[in-house]
Amino acid sequence: MSRTVMAFDYGTKSIGSAIGQEITGTASPLKAFKANDGIPNWDEIEKQIKEWQPNLLIVGLPTDLHGKDLDTITPRAKKFAQRLHGRFGLPVELHDERLSTTEARAELFAMGGYKALSKGNVDCQSAVIILESWFESQWG
């Protein structure tokens, strides 16, 4: 059975999201949620989850290039993941997001130049990269 999976690129000002199907291993950008010091409008996230009905949620885990936790943002991303699970009762996994923002910017710039590099676009494309990376990790 193929699962529908939703991913989030957590940030303190914006949280990008993407949706994908495990059977194809591909993802598409959804919406960037504005956050106030890392706290999103949970009603908006709930609306998106109800609309897409994912079986699993993935949250990008920010680390340094060596895979070590970053002092401020890593614990907050973990807390966001815990809150997603607590609010919606869906399984949540953390997945390495190293260099996803850099890759997202490069992809968006190649597609649309500087105009494509809005914060929301970058965050959602980062969520796509996180999700597709998670799919690849499942195929081992």
Curated annotation (Swiss-Prot):
One Pfam assignment: RuvX
Record GO cellular component, one term: cytoplasm
Enzyme class: hydrolase
Top-rank taxon, per record: Bacteria
UniProt keywords, alphabetically: Cytoplasm, Hydrolase, Nuclease, Ribosome biogenesis
Protein name as it appears in the record: Putative pre-16S rRNA nuclease
Compartments where found: Cytoplasm
A GO molecular function held by the record: nuclease activity
HAMAP family: Nuclease_YqgF
Transmembrane segments annotated in the record for this chain: none
Enzyme Commission numbers on file: 3.1.-.-
Job description of the protein: Could be a nuclease involved in processing of the 5'-end of pre-16S rRNA.
Listed GO biological process terms: rRNA 5'-end processing
Entry-linked SUPFAM superfamilies: Ribonuclease H-like
Stated family: Belongs to the YqgF nuclease family.
